[in-house]
Regions:
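Topology signature of small-to-medium multi-pass alpha-helical membrane proteins
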Residues: 1-165
Length: 165
């Protein structure tokens, strides 16, 4: 992978956007991880939940922390170290993967609600906002993945594949 000529302004904008995403992921991940740790190990079965985030997803919080740290790896891009674009690409890939998993869970909840409706239960849209995930489609990792799409577009546009001689 070679990097085409990238202006200093573009590099700084990409770095600032990546840092903003990284900080958001770190905030969401640390809250989810801390509340899940509290509910799992300190106050067993406790219902602690901060800012409406799920309080029982320890591994989702850890994944969000990792994604935030990967996005923060793009900080050297501010000084023109264009090799840091890889952190943006990997962070966006991890972000999209986590969002896809959560969207599949929401879809499975919808399928469950539909099958229950077919068997005679009353239809409810609750699966969309309060399903297995606790927050359903309002899960912050889903929306943060959508926020990372402009960044990955610019990063992919500024890179191209080339053959090594």
């Amino acid at each position: 992978m070679t990097v085409t000529k990238l202006s200093e302004r573009s590099g700084r904008c990409m770095a600032a956007y990546a840092v903003a995403l990284g900080v958001l992921y770190l905030m969401v991940g640390s809250i989810e991880f801390a509340t899940a740790f509290w509910n799992w190990f300190i106050e067993l079965g406790g219902g602690l939940s901060l800012l409406g985030l799920p309080g029982d997803d320890l591994f989702g919080g850890f994944a969000a922390l990792v994604i935030g740290l990967v996005f923060l790896g793009a900080i050297p891009l501010w000084k023109g170290s264009y090799e840091s674009i890889g952190f943006i690409l990997i962070g966006s890939l991890l972000s999209a993967t986590l969002a896809a998993v959560y969207l599949l869970i929401v879809g499975a909840d919808g399928l469950t609600a539909w099958l229950a409706h077919l068997s005679g239960e009353e239809w409810s849209w609750e699966w969309l906002t309060a399903g297995t995930l606790g927050t359903g489609i309002f899960r912050p990792e889903i929306w943060l993945a959508f926020l990372s799409t402009p960044l990955v577009y610019i990063a992919l546009k500024s890179t191209r594949t080339g053959r090594q001689a």
